[in-house]
Curated annotation (Swiss-Prot):
One of its GO terms (cellular component) is cytosol. InterPro entries: A-amylase/branching_C, Branching_enzy, GlgB, GlgB_N_E_set_prok, Glyco_hydro_13_cat_dom, Glyco_hydro_13_N, Glyco_hydro_b, Glycoside_hydrolase_SF. This is 1,4-alpha-glucan branching enzyme GlgB 1. Monomer. The lineage of its organism: Bacteria, Bacillati, Bacillota, Clostridia, Eubacteriales. Its EC number is 2.4.1.18. HAMAP family: GlgB. Belongs to the glycosyl hydrolase 13 family. GlgB subfamily. It catalyses: Transfers a segment of a (1->4)-alpha-D-glucan chain to a primary hydroxy group in a similar glucan chain.
Length: 674
């Protein structure tokens, strides 16, 4: 139950304050801490997993398991499992421990590995079997029981990483995320997944060699359907058993940290799966979902939306975030489908939704939940980042909550992604008519702290793979991909790339089979593309101009944004060191331009330091090997001019160099571009 109050013209949703005294006589011989329960029912217990669910413990000198469940409108609840032949027995009946819906029981002599569920009798006389909402391990699908599991500790060896994480300013650091689906990255054979432990041997090495800074795992919470990719969750605290056990996942994360790779987890706090064993109508009535059917039912995805105003649901979800932060050492959460949470009319037609108390379409409870989530993580887990997948123009997503923002650290730039993909799908002949597709994103670039995403959503459902989206014949597709990627890495904002794009897989991603790694060995262009991505990733990571001032207006400057006739874009990326900058020349047509003049800000010697048209990458080899000397003369509103060669469908990057004990004239005499 909640109260809505208006204070200082701001809406505040506050839980009804529950008097602590209410619990004191009902705490089963003081097994439960009254403050924990109080905070749980206030929506402010962020470690509820420490007492909810199943916990091995000793009571009255007996070793066993304490089970605790929230089911406020259940009539009776029994624990059933293979220990009881799945029969309800009076000695396994849970006790109601307070009038707000908590139930609990201690059962001695239970062992790890026992399968169990809750048999919940509803007020209407019907009964249903439910998995434990706080259960930390489950049967492999299609089976659905929870499995008793001791708190699984491993010997962590990532202290150095965690200390570094806490001290890092991620806004001024390189972030280059490799998004992957563990079940289809690599497999043993057609039908067998690699386990967490097997992945810990190969994945960290691969990601480090490729030059990525982070991985982002698609959801690893337990889910019944492989084809949902993990986004329709039944067990929020249960790490999916498809790939092994809890310790295995911890060892995988530990191995990634030891290789200086951060771990971001895709997380779905907005809606949940309708399967009977899950949270849906948990006690026979709307429990985790909204009471109002229109508000609960997510018709677009066939799921139910969480009631983000219920205190116990808030405790459940925010505790779930901290469960993975504290127990698994994850470094960030990518929050899925934030738009679905923010808008009452998201995915609904006119007449299918009811406005909020102010007449608007904003979900006020969800806004408050998101703010509390981000505030809690910033307060208690310094260095852990949160990322919003938010597809609308909702303002201040990455602004601090104290200034009216939602409090996320980063937001996916879906507008940039849509515009740039549309541009690169065009025949180069027509690109001059759509020149603003690549310039417009800079108009709003500093409104949020953006991540530029090329995610799994862009390479499925008939959208084509990334390489196949590119226009032209075989050669041009690869050259266009390289140019697009170099432009992306030069554009302000952190980076995210989905697995398989890094070697140009032509088929769309399919969750039921591994990536086509064989292409790298069989075909030169795929091997060269793979090497290109490795070089591009490391070029990005090793040059602070490409990330240090991502969110500072001084970090980017157009030299020429208006050359639509030739589809050429020229810009500068800068660092805090005013002497360091990189000049990007991006050509999105298959034309070569010789003796091409560009404006540069300073007199000096320049050198081409990266070129996507290198033969080693599969290009035509139109590169500049020597040094270049700028001459005085205005060009592109810059005081000096540099004459270069512009390679076809490619990006070339230049920097100004200074060599000790050599004059610029001497350098020029020694080197010329070819």
């Amino acid at each position: 139950m909640t109260l809505v109050e208006v204070k200082d013209d701001k809406l505040e949703i506050k839980p009804v304050r529950l008097r602590k005294e209410k619990y004191k006589a009902q705490l089963e011989n003081k097994i439960f801490n009254e403050d924990e329960l109080y905070l749980f029912h206030e929506g402010r217990n962020y470690n509820a997993y420490n007492f909810m669910g199943a916990h091995f413990t000793s009571e009255n000198r007996k070793r066993g398991v304490r089970f605790t469940l929230w089911a406020p409108r259940a009539k009776n609840i029994f624990l059933v499992g293979d220990f009881s032949n799945w029969e309800t027995k009076e000695e396994n009946k849970l006790n109601r421990i307070n009038e707000t819906g908590l139930w609990s029981i201690f059962i001695p002599r239970l062992k790890e590995g026992i399968k169990y569920k809750y048999y919940i009798e509803q007020e209407d006389g019907k009964a249903v079997l439910k998995a434990d909402p706080y259960g930390i391990y489950s049967e492999v699908r299609p089976n659905t029981a929870s499995i008793l599991c001791e708190k699984t500790k491993i010997r962590w060896s990532d202290k150095k990483w965690l200390n570094k994480r806490e001290a890092t300013n991620y806004f001024e650091s390189p972030i280059n995320i490799y998004e992957l689906h563990l079940g289809s990255w690599k497999r043993k054979d057609e039908d067998e997944f690699l386990s967490y432990d097997e992945l810990s041997v190969v994945l960290p090495k691969y990601v480090k060699e490729m030059g990525y800074t982070h991985v982002e795992f698609m959801p690893l919470n337990e889910h019944p359907l492989d084809a949902s990719w993990g986004y329709q969750v039944t067990g929020y605290y249960s790490v999916t058993s498809r790939y092994g056990d809890i310790k295995g996942l911890k060892r995988l994360i530990n191995a990634l940290h030891k290789n200086d790779i951060g771990v971001i987890l895709d997380w779905v706090p907005g809606h949940f799966c309708k399967d009977e064993q899950g949270l849906y109508m948990f006690d026979g009535t709307p429990t985790y979902e909204y009471e109002e059917k229109w508000k609960a039912d997510n018709k677009g995805w066939g799921t139910f939306n969480f009631d983000l105003g219920k205190p116990e649901v808030k405790s459940f979800l925010i505790s779930n975030a901290f469960y993975f932060i504290n127990e698994f050492h994850i470094d960030g959460l990518r929050v899925d489908a934030v738009s679905n949470m923010l808008y009452l009319n998201y995915g609904r037609n006119h007449g299918e939704w009811i406005p909020n108390i102010y007449g608007g379409n904003e979900n006020l409870e969800a806004i408050q939940f998101i703010k509390e989530l981000n505030e809690a993580i910033k307060t208690y887990s310094k260095g852990v980042i949160t990322i919003a997948e938010e597809s609308t123009s909702w303002p201040n997503v990455t602004n601090d909550t104290e200034y009216g923002g939602l409090g996320f650290d980063f937001k996916w730039n879906m507008g940039w992604m849509n515009d740039t993909l549309e541009y690169n799908e065009l025949d180069p002949i027509y690109r001059k008519y759509h020149h603003n597709k690549l310039t417009f994103p800079m108009m709003y670039n500093h409104s949020e702290k953006f991540i530029l995403p090329i995610s799994h959503d862009e390479v499925v459902h008939g959208k084509k793979s990334l390489i196949d989206k590119m226009q032209g014949d075989y050669w041009n597709k690869f050259s266009n991909l390289r140019a697009y990627m170099a432009y992306m890495y030069g554009h302000p904002g952190k980076k995210l790339m989905f697995m398989g794009c890094e070697f140009g897989q032509f088929i769309e991603w399919r969750e039921y089979e591994e990536l086509e790694w064989k292409l790298i060995d069989k075909f030169d262009m795929h091997r060269k593309t793979h090497n290109f991505f490795k070089d591009l990733n490391n070029f990005y990571k090793n040059n602070s101009e490409l990330w240090e001032l991502d969110y500072d207006g001084d970090g980017f400057q157009w030299i020429d944004a208006d050359n639509n006739e030739q589809s050429i874009y020229i810009f500068i990326r800068k660092s805090k060191n005013i002497e360091k900058y990189k000049i990007f020349v991006c050509n999105f047509t298959p034309m070569v331009y010789y003796d091409f003049n560009i404006g540069v800000p300073e007199k000096g010697v320049y050198r081409e330091i990266f070129n996507t048209d290198k033969k080693e990458y599969g290009g035509s080899g139109q590169v500049i090997k020597g040094n270049l000397f700028s001459r005085k003369g205005w060009c592109h509103n810059q005081p000096y001019t540099l004459t270069i060669k512009v390679p076809p469908m490619a990006v070339s990057v230049f920097e100004r160099i200074i060599e000790e004990n050599k004059t610029e004239e001497k350098i020029v005499k020694e080197d010329k571009y070819i």
